[in-house]
Amino acid sequence: MSNHDYADIVDQTIRRIGKHLILGLPLGLGKPNRLINAFYQRACEDSSIRLDIVTALSLNPPKPGSELEARFLEPFLARHFGEDYPRLAYADALAARQLPDNITVTEFYFQSGSMLGNSEAQRRYVSSNYTHVARDLADRGVNLTLQLVARRNTDSGPQYSLSCNPDVTLDLVEEFRQRPEQDCLMLAQVHPDLPFMAGDAVVDEHFFDRVIDSDPQQPLFALPRSPIDTRDYCVGMNASALVADAGTLQIGIGSLSDGLVDGLIRRQHHNEDYRAYFSDTLPGQALIDAIGGLDAFDTGLYGASEMFLDGFMHLYQAGILKREVFDDEALQSLANEGRIDEQPGVKGTGALMDGAFFLGSSDFYQWLRELNEDERPRFRMSSVGRINQLYGGTERLETLQRQKARFINTCMMVGLTGAATSDGLKDHQLVSGVGGQYNFVAMAHAMRDGRSILMLRSTRESKGKTHSNIVWEYPHVTIPRHLRDIVVTEYGIADLRGRSDEECIQALLQISDSEFQESLRQQAVNAGKLHPDWEIPTEAQHNHAATLARRLETAGGRDAWPDYPAGSDFTDTEQRLVKALGQLKAAMHSKATLLSAAIQSGPDDREALERMGLAQPGTLKERLYARLLRWALRSH
């Protein structure tokens, strides 16, 4: 499709709705970049047009921040995203603080950390539960939406699927049905590689005002797979033991969730090693016996998650995602009782996964495209209004379907009395957004056998210093303490539901890093929230990295815990470079370390240096880069 064709669509749209375009765009994958860029470019050229973009998670391939990063990233990005990936022009302009005066961008969820310090983005951030986004879009007067869709031909005519993004679109259409005075023009563009997804995502040709049936020439944005380190594995293992057989699973994105999925697969297929990991008692291990387990899954799990991602694919392939649900209360009750065989022809037809949006690796997208006609209906996409809450008229059915639910998310910090910080900093700078986290925490409390689990690393590194992520207090709160439930770190499990403040403090101190336990304990004592005589139990006084390494050693040996258990988008050499460059970045905060590295250097790692274009350094700067890189590569 030519630029002229896109320009014609812009002309026709402006003639219909005028020069004030309030443009709603889907979160993440479903944005038709070239079409969006055509509207953005027109507004840049014509200042009489006002373009207000309302969206979330605007994805662009990363831009290198230094020369060394560029040497590593540029070849990888060209290979991974293609040479001509159509970047979102508005997102680049926003990041560069160069938006024209007649264009605004309002988002309810940022790519993590991408907008810290960006005043324009921070000022226009909207804090909204995922389930409230459609309402808020309508309140802002959205009069135009653009979205990628999938298409298939049937005997009765073409069918369309909202595919990766029925999440807000379906709720928005329902919102407009209740507001007949508001008009919104809905345009869709067919993407030939977008998987055709089943469920409520399937719509007919009249759902949109116009369908553009031409290739957008836009590779699906595939997330590069991230490494999992020792702490990620341990957090994931601890959380995996809280998942009950015949239960329901919701997970988010990130290396902690990847560690959780890996833990569930080990529980299923390497159960002896899995049990060995828990041979030394963890803080909070009694909760495993009460609500989870160490046995392999028999009935399996059902996925009900706002985000459908690679992890669910791996769980399906591992024979864990196999518990069926049915959209009929009587059938679902039979299924929960293990009596679905009493209904001939029903077993094997239920859904295994209900999601609201998907985003993942290129392998994940290919797997979705290749689902056979028996499998495809078992992986359904629906509105976030249905996935992220119980109410809406089918509460009893959804409660039956979501039995023994474990809603597992990540956070950045936890206060000692149980409040969690997941999306922002103390000066109200937003790191990401609340998304659906509050929805799932609230839903866990609304269900008799549901639990909310928040995972976090006990510490973080910043500017060469280690800081505790379990704190006495923090000014920014995402989940208030009255909704406290379960917190998991690499050192153990803290069960906070229904506990007193003192009991919460005691539980969280036991899963904190030992470097910070005493100072935190003293703060709680000084505040009158902890008895002065209470001491950290002996078994929780050795919460150090060495303890974690020993625990993994007992569960199959160190080689059983690779950096990329589900595969990598990087070559073997690039995987070593990722570690080395990370080590160099951390060293940048210490001039002494950098000087020592430059002097010591390391052996000549020809393959890695060639990949970075530093095998034959010419300039003084290149020779310095080569020495620093050889130093960082020594242990990788």
Where are these regions (language model features)?
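Conserved alpha/beta enzyme-core scaffold
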Residues: 1-636
